[in-house]
Amino acid sequence: MPALSTAVASGRKKRGEGHTRREEILQAAKELFLEEGYDATTIRRIADRVGVSAPALYLYFHDKEAMMLALCDQTFGRLIERITDIENTVSDPLERVRHFGDAYARFGLEHPDEYRLVFIGNNIPESVRKVGHRMPIDDPTRPGVGGALVFSRLVTMLSQLEASGVKLNYPTDTCAELCWMGIHGVVAAMIMKPEFPWSNREMLIKGMQDIMIRGILK
C-alpha cells in the first residue's frame, strides 16, 4: 500500500490551497458555535468536523477566540459592503440613516445564522465584549474591530445629518445606539421566533425606523 503524502497525513492543504482550508475551519467553527455554544466547543471538536488533526488548526488560528473574531469580522465585512453602497448612492443625510437601518435589517434576516452568532447570546469573547462598539478603529485590521467599524459609520451618518441643519435630541453616539437597539430588537425577534405569526415584516421594519427617527430628531 503506498504511503500517505506528508500533506495528507498532517491535514495540510497543498500549496496554494490554504485559503480554502481556512474557510473550511471557519465554517466548521460557526456550525459548532451555533450547535453547542462557544464555551462548549473545543478545538478538537472543530478539527474533527473539518477532518484534520487539532495541531493542523493552529497553522491557521492560534486559538478558538481567533476563530470567533474572524467570523465576526467576516460577517461585519459583508454588512460594511452594503453600508458603503448606501454612502456611494444616497446623498440625502436622513435617507442615508433610513437606508442604513433597512440594510442592517435585511442583512440580518438574510443571514440568520451569522446574526445569531454575532449578535445574540454570549458567543463574543470577553476581550471584545468589554469594549464592544467603542473599540478603537484606528487599525481596521485589528481582530474583532468589525462591529466598531459598522457603528462608526452610523455615527458618521448621524453627524452628517446634524451638520445639514437637523437637530438631534441626544448626542450622536447615543442616537446611534438608540437606532441600533431599535432595529436589532426587530431583527432578533424575527430570527429567534420564526414561527411567530408576525403581521407584516416589511411594515414592522419600516415602523420601527419611523419610531426611531421621530425619537432622535428635535
Model-derived segments and their meaning:
Residues 1-20, 31:
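N-terminal intrinsically disordered/low-complexity leader segments
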Residues 32, 86, 107, 157, ...:
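Short alpha-helical functional segments enriched in proximate histidine and acidic residues
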Residues 24, 28, 32-66, 70:
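Helix-turn-helix
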Residues 25-33, 75, 79, 104:
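Short hydrophobic clusters on alpha-helical segments that form packing/core surfaces
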Residues 115-116, 130-131, 136-144, 151, ...:
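Hydrophobic/aromatic-rich alpha-helical bundle segments in the mid-to-C-terminal region
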Residues 70, 84-114, 146, 172, ...:
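Hydrophobic alpha-helical connector segments
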Residues 71-99, 129-132, 137-139, 154:
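Amphipathic alpha-helical linker/stalk segments
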Residues 35-39, 90, 111, 164:
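Short coil/turn segments at alpha/beta junctions that flank glycine-rich nucleotide-binding fingerprints
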